[in-house]
Amino acid sequence: MQVSQALDIMEALYRAAEHPDITEIKRYGRDAEPGGQSPAGIRLWHESGSSSMLWAAVPHRDAQPLPLGEMPPPRLRFWRLLVLTHQILDVAQPEPFASWELCATPGVGWTENGHPTPSALRITCRDRTVLHLRATATSGDRREPETDPYPDYQIPEGVREWHHKVSAPSAGHV
């Protein structure tokens, strides 16, 4: 699976998830493969003006799988993005993806309560391609809330139907 194909799926899923804190979703980067000067990714803008990004990185051979855990507070945007993405994938079960897991990358992040923080999502595709999608974040012009402003958010059922929106044939001119 190509990086762009995986990012197409992720972008469609973020849009279908309709999270109320996400105000804009944009693609960026020109690289077709991880490791270049312009990594391909998706940037999500939040109500606070901060952003979180999921981008294709070269997999680290010592990346350590981590359990999903609880949703972290808004100030940890990169971590929230990873947890939200995992939760969305759990609901959507996209056919091209065989499995996904959070990973800690050696030398990235810190230790929280004796455990490393996640820094990436490892996706194993059905064609045996392994994608390593790193998460990073930027600050916004407003302070992040201390607690989740949308604690009752549930991933909508429409996420299960994402593939119908992405792969449906166009009703072009005949």
Question: Over which residues does each language-model region extend?
Answer:
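Intrinsic disorder/low-complexity detector
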Residues: 1-29, 48, 54-110, 139-174
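Amphipathic, interaction-prone secondary-structure segments
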Residues: 25-51, 108-128
